[in-house]
């Protein structure tokens, strides 16, 4: 009664839509790609903006570096924008994250954690990446790291990430 069944990726995708995400970039990587593919496959989910209809633009990029930089660029135009990745992809995004942090760009990065080092175990999840998210980047800059504990938190944190990013003008990393 009053409940729906969702995967974690679907909960994050719907949370991003609730949070006003208008641009979602990604490079296919397990397990993060399912989120963007869910948004893309469900274009029936329309969002109202200023009395008109709108939707989320989903862009599959050539690599993770382009994904984070495209999301930052979209944010600079005034759109609420995000990207999603997992461990190895986040490693490639660090320079773009540093640039966003230095320039106070309110971009959201959804970081799907994997267990184990390197490419990890794509089908097993853990919190091995928390420290990396907190300290990633060249030099010091402000950032917010949200670490969701369950599907409900994934949903609400995905929406809240955009509010924090916009209010404090910093990158937000959402760990799931």
Feature map (PLM): residue ranges:
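Structural signature of the thiamine diphosphate
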Residues: 1, 143-176
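Thiamine diphosphate
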Residues: 1-136, 141-143, 147-148
